[in-house]
């Protein structure tokens, strides 16, 4: 078995569009194509040089067969390209990256594109009783986004109920969650103001129609929407007298991200300067209703796999499905909050489900470069009780 080192030679993401916002007219497959094309162009790699593509996507209904392949062909990759769509809910993009790394490590590929894409704005409604005709009574529409993206498959409850359970079990009050959310927004706003995201973002042209020029979207839409007074006063959503609100949870969004992974031999052959090396990963799972704290189980596994001590880690990216997720996992692992999500996260920037896992790897790689740091850990929880984590090293 081959066991080559795997490098990230390119990492990009689209801006994240608000729900029903600038990207509402673009399907997830189009956003994915833009990310893949942008990632390849950054390092001047020909589409025909790519061996395989893994792309995460969660709500695939109405997108057509194998969204990953549509993303690849839309980016100009040849029809011979092997493509796999990955659905591990919010961890899909990270799992796609892990699969890509494993494919290279086993000698089955030298160049892999991995990432994820989601258009939550375009998630359809289902009419499940209409296949053979409703026999009697009213016909209901089922929200595909809620059913397949944001609800527990086992008890049918929204993900926010699990967030409330997390807050209760780990004694995290409303004020702490609101404070974290405000911090996330301010960090994201600062990152935009200082152009910290500039390197990782590939702009997206959106057709406007009626003879008007296309609109060029270059930054995330959500961070500017902070209203501190409103955030602190909005009512809890999932539980009477609860602590989780629409304002301290992640938003619904559209976006995509893509990484170009490469074997050590191919990096040397092409004379490229990688962004980072993938040195380990780990995954974990527990009760579905406790998925919120699964990153605290996956991160130690990833560190062990990488042969890294927690004290060696410079920065963390823990996906902010809810403020309570980042707060709880930071608390459980005893992390320094000043080294977690330093440019904001899903609460302020957005959480397009299939993309977030690879998006945080992308962001982390640039943080390591900007901060002249060495080791970074990214982790993301996923519905059903799981989490994935990955360790990267700047080279």
Swiss-Prot record:
The active site is at 90 (acyl-thioester intermediate), 351 (proton acceptor), 381 (proton acceptor). Keywords: Acyltransferase, Cytoplasm, Metal-binding, Potassium, Transferase. It catalyses: 2 acetyl-CoA = acetoacetyl-CoA + CoA. SUPFAM superfamilies: Thiolase-like (SSF53901). CoA binds at residues 185, 230, 250. GO terms for cellular component: cytosol; mitochondrion. Pathway: Metabolic intermediate biosynthesis; (R)-mevalonate biosynthesis; (R)-mevalonate from acetyl-CoA: step 1/3. K(+) binds at residues 185, 246-247, 249, 347. It is found in: Cytoplasm. It comes from the Eukaryota. GO terms for molecular function: acetyl-CoA C-acetyltransferase activity; metal ion binding. InterPro entries: Thiolase, Thiolase-like, Thiolase_AS, Thiolase_C, Thiolase_CS, Thiolase_N. Pfam families: Thiolase_C, Thiolase_N. GO terms for biological process: ergosterol biosynthetic process; farnesyl diphosphate biosynthetic process, mevalonate pathway. Its EC number is 2.3.1.9. NCBIfam families: AcCoA-C-Actrans. Belongs to the thiolase-like superfamily. Thiolase family. Acetyl-CoA acetyltransferase; part of the first module of ergosterol biosynthesis pathway that includes the early steps of the pathway, conserved across all eukaryotes, and which results in the formation of mevalonate from acetyl-coenzyme A (acetyl-CoA). Erg10 catalyzes the formation of acetoacetyl-CoA from acetyl-CoA. The first module starts with the action of the cytosolic acetyl-CoA acetyltransferase eg10 that catalyzes the formation of acetoacetyl-CoA. The hydroxymethylglutaryl-CoA synthases erg13 then condenses acetyl-CoA with acetoacetyl-CoA to form HMG-CoA. Homotetramer. This is Acetyl-CoA acetyltransferase. It comes from Schizosaccharomyces pombe (strain 972 / ATCC 24843) (Fission yeast). The gene is erg10.
């Amino acid at each position: 078995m081959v066991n080559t080192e795997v490098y990230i030679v390119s990492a990009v993401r689209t801006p994240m569009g608000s729900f029903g916002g600038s990207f509402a007219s673009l399907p997830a497959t189009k956003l994915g194509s833009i990310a893949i094309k942008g990632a390849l162009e950054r390092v001047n790699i020909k589409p025909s040089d790519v061996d395989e593509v893994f792309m995460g996507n969660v709500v695939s209904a109405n997108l057509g067969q194998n969204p990953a392949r549509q993303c690849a062909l839309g980016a100009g990759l040849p029809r011979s390209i092997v493509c796999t769509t990955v659905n591990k809910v919010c961890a899909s993009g990270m799992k796609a990256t892990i699969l890509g790394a494993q494919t290279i490590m086993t000698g089955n590929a030298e160049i892999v594109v991995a990432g994820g894409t989601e258009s939550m704005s375009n998630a359809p409604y289902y009419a499940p009783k209409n296949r053979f005709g409703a026999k009697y009574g009213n016909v209901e529409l089922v929200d595909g986004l809620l059913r397949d993206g944001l609800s527990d498959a086992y008890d049918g409850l929204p993900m926010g109920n699990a967030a409330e359970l997390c807050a209760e079990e780990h004694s995290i009050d409303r004020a702490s969650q609101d404070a974290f959310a405000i911090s996330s927004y301010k960090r994201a706003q600062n990152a935009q103001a200082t152009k910290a995201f500039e390197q990782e973002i590939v702009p997206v042209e959106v057709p406007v129609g009626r003879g008007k020029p296309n609109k060029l979207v270059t930054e995330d839409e959500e961070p500017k929407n902070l209203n501190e007074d409103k955030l602190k006063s909005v009512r809890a959503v999932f539980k009477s007298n609860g602590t989780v609100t629409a304002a301290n949870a992640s938003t619904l969004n559209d976006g995509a991200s893509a990484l170009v992974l490469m074997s050590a031999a191919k990096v040397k052959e092409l004379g490229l300067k990688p962004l980072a090396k993938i040195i380990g990963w780990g995954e974990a799972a527990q009760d579905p209703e406790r998925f919120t704290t699964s990153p605290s189980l996956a991160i130690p596994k990833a560190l062990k796999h990488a042969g890294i001590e927690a004290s060696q880690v410079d920065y963390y990216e823990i996906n902010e499905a809810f403020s309570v997720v980042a707060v709880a996992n930071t608390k459980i692992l005893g992390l320094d909050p000043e080294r977690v999500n330093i440019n904001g996260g899903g609460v302020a920037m957005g959480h397009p489900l299939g993309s977030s896992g690879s998006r945080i790897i992308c962001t982390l790689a640039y943080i390591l470069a900007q901060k002249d740091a060495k080791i970074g850990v990214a982790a993301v929880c996923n519905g059903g009780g799981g989490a994935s984590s990955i360790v990267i090293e700047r080279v």
